[in-house]
Amino acid sequence: MNKDIATPIRTKEILKKYGFSFKKSLGQNFLIDTNILNRIVDHAEVTEKTGVIEIGPGIGALTEQLAKRAKKVVAFEIDQRLLPILKDTLSPYENVTVIHQDVLKADVKSVIEEQFQDCDEIMVVANLPYYVTTPIIMKLLEEHLPLKGIVVMLQKEVAERMAADPSSKEYGSLSIAVQFYTEAKTVMIVPKTVFVPQPNVDSAVIRLILRDGPAVDVENESFFFQLIKASFAQRRKTLLNNLVNNLPEGKAQKSTIEQVLEETNIDGKRRGESLSIEEFAALSNGLYKALF
């Protein structure tokens, strides 16, 4: 029996056999530690009833561990050079489908409908390329896909921002966007030494469990996120200054903004990072009614 793909020796053999060279532009860093891969699968609670979407399978190291436990794995791979490698390394597993496509351009909902009809739940599990982590996660959340959750490895700093609490250094618009849709928790720190090539920073695994509905009720989701973006536009400025300077028509509506801040008992001298998601929702709803 061949060793697992993720063992350093097997990874080296595969890369040598295909003369594969890493593309920095695609953020390719392959994991060479089977124990860590298995812990990721554990955190995703993958069972024989789970359908799994993987993004960026590389040479199939995580895919293999997922395939051993899941009912079905569908992996999106953007790099054409990896397709013959994946066909080879994953040949023992009949429950794996590789799609050669950029997941950001893919109709993921249709893929789910076609591929996972006989699965009880769907998880996204992946070692995401650093350079597109946030766009991928926001696409998965904003498209309201029928997912149970998302368990992904990403840059440690980004994971900390996603799971951050108000008033912390890491808390910002990304924290609120992710926590609006999910319950977020960093479940593992992964040292940079277990990758080839070795990245410059450590990684973390974050678990995002989809909420039944948004964390807070908002009158208009689009305006809510517009308000969040404006509130964090310049972190050192007060909330009032940020809203006046960064909301469309903010300057013309300064008195309205001040009035709504007063009505919602939010001090305009505070900074955006001190507001909870509930306070942002109250402010968003008040402003939306007053402005539109």
Swiss-Prot record:
Alphabetical list of Gene3D superfamilies matching this protein: Ribosomal RNA adenine dimethylase-like, domain 2 (1.10.8.100), Vaccinia Virus protein VP39 (3.40.50.150)
Annotated family: Belongs to the class I-like SAM-binding methyltransferase superfamily. rRNA adenine N(6)-methyltransferase family. RsmA subfamily.
Enzyme's top EC category: transferase
GO biological process, one term: rRNA methylation
Catalytic activity: adenosine(1518)/adenosine(1519) in 16S rRNA + 4 S-adenosyl-L-methionine = N(6)-dimethyladenosine(1518)/N(6)-dimethyladenosine(1519) in 16S rRNA + 4 S-adenosyl-L-homocysteine + 4 H(+)
GO cellular component, one term: cytosol
Protein name from the UniProt record: Ribosomal RNA small subunit methyltransferase A
This protein's UniProt keywords: Cytoplasm, Methyltransferase, RNA-binding, rRNA processing, S-adenosyl-L-methionine, Transferase
